[in-house]
Design a protein with these regions (language model features):
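Residue-level detector of alpha-helical secondary structure
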Residues: 6, 12, 16-23, 27, ...
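Acidic, low-complexity, intrinsically disordered interaction modules
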Residues: 23-81
Length: 90
């Protein structure tokens, strides 16, 4: 039987601070949910679950040390520098 090991990855403080700063300008409060690494024991299969940031009911996904955030899924991404304008249009 396969055993899946899950280890939580806390969101990077620099990323968290940047997003909080952007949200302050947009008069909104983000909710942060830490990502995780899921590893199938005795294999080389790993899955990195991104950090989730919920802003105005929209879920954004972000990886630590990344420059992009993803909107709802990993198909649509925007640069963190464009996040403020995107939030204003929500």
């Amino acid at each position: 039987m396969l055993k899946v090991i899950t280890k939580e990855i806390p969101i990077n403080e620099e990323l968290k601070t940047r997003i909080q700063f952007i949200c302050d300008f947009c008069n909104t409060t983000p909710t942060f949910i830490n990502g995780s690494i899921r590893k199938v024991e005795k294999t080389n299969i790993n899955y990195i679950e991104p950090n989730k940031i919920i802003i105005k009911g929209t879920t954004f996904l972000a990886f630590n040390h990344g420059r992009d955030v993803y909107v709802e899924n990993l198909q649509k991404h925007i640069n963190i520098s464009d996040l403020q304008e995107f939030i204003k249009n929500l």
